[in-house]
Amino acid sequence: MAGKRDYYEILGVEKGADQDTIKKAYRKLAMQFHPDKNPGNKEAEEKFKEAAGAYEVLSDAQKRAQYDRFGHDAFTRGGGGGGFTDAEDIFSHFGDIFGDFFGGGMGGQQRQRRNRNEPRRGSDLRYVTEITLKDVITGIEKEIEFDTDKNCDECKGTGAEKGSQVSTCGTCGGSGQVVRQQGFFAMASTCPTCHGQGTVIKNPCKPCKGKGRVAEHRKIRLNIPAGVDTGTRLRVATEGEGGYMGGPPGDLYVEIRVKQHNNFERRNEDLFAELSLPYVQMLLGAEIEVPTVTGKAKLEVPKGTHHGDNVKLVGEGLPSLRGNRRGDIYFTVNVQFPEKLHKDEEKLLREIAKARGLNVTSEGGFFGKKK
């Protein structure tokens, strides 16, 4: 059995595509391969189901995060997601999307937009915050601020002034859509009277101007655990957009970005840095003090270290997000020569060269001429 195609490839979008781009790409494929437009075409039906399976995962923030990390394996061990058996299953799952194109008539089932007075969950929100490499080691509590919407307290989300009524739109009959027939297909568009809401407000609520929603500025404290990396997403339940008409709020997803450090390069839990050492310490070995992200530590340089060798400082890297280990720091050693030799140093080196049978320049050569 051939492996499953990449979901982003199926929809024809980049991996970093936003939800609007993903939704538009899926709509385009749904129109192209819809069974009503391709009666009896099994290949079109399979492509239709394939696109629906991809959209089911990529349109859900949690499922998409799992897929981005583990691929199809995220859903092969009871994880759920990405599977439809027939067209009716797809229609029931994505009725609101298809309704925009087919006037609610999908597979012989009449569908309507949600009533604005029906309780609905608020949307999920995305927030990006930046932390330092030191924060990755220690963890940090940060205060974040963002703007969102919630139900208007005055009208409780109805959009109507107290004591006035919300009536069903006479133009669309409450569906939020007007339908026109074009040959075999019934094509729908947003109702121009109620703008897709299905209801008409005669006396709008003044605080929210009839929208039923008001802006809200929110501050929350967020605990960022040690070991996170750029791209890590933290879910804060119920801190997203407020629900509609008493519905539950959405969630807040905070994406982490780690600032680049001046001295250290990160590779998973390990850190890498450059270290210049005098040739004598490299030859004879030494215990030296080196910088770390949070301070300083002692590093044992082995005897006979070569230029370009990596010397490891154990346990001074970054913690694992799961908390079961800590990485190391690798110092790439560069040989450091003195600008000028003292006479006794030069004498000793010449004696070493003579003992090893090495040909060197005469006295007053390279080091002797440098000022």
Curated annotation (Swiss-Prot):
The J domain is necessary and sufficient to stimulate DnaK ATPase activity. Zinc center 1 plays an important role in the autonomous, DnaK-independent chaperone activity of DnaJ. Zinc center 2 is essential for interaction with DnaK and for DnaJ activity. A zinc finger (CR-type) spans 139-217. CXXCXGXG motif repeats lie at residues 152-159, 169-176, 191-198, 205-212. GO terms for molecular function: ATP binding; heat shock protein binding; unfolded protein binding; zinc ion binding. HAMAP family: DnaJ. Residues 104-123 are annotated as: Disordered. Residues 6-71 form the J domain. GO terms for biological process: chaperone cofactor-dependent protein refolding; DNA replication; protein refolding; response to heat. Participates actively in the response to hyperosmotic and heat shock by preventing the aggregation of stress-denatured proteins and by disaggregating proteins, also in an autonomous, DnaK-independent fashion. Unfolded proteins bind initially to DnaJ; upon interaction with the DnaJ-bound protein, DnaK hydrolyzes its bound ATP, resulting in the formation of a stable complex. GrpE releases ADP from DnaK; ATP binding to DnaK triggers the release of the substrate protein, thus completing the reaction cycle. The keyword Chaperone applies. Binds 2 Zn(2+) ions per monomer. One of its GO terms (cellular component) is cytoplasm. Belongs to the DnaJ family. The gene is dnaJ. It comes from Bdellovibrio bacteriovorus (strain ATCC 15356 / DSM 50701 / NCIMB 9529 / HD100). Homodimer. This is Chaperone protein DnaJ. The keyword Cytoplasm applies. It comes from the Bacteria. PANTHER family: CHAPERONE PROTEIN DNAJ, DNAJ HOMOLOG 1, MITOCHONDRIAL-RELATED. Zn(2+) 2 binds at residues 169, 172, 191, 194. It is found in: Cytoplasm. Its cofactor is Zn(2+).
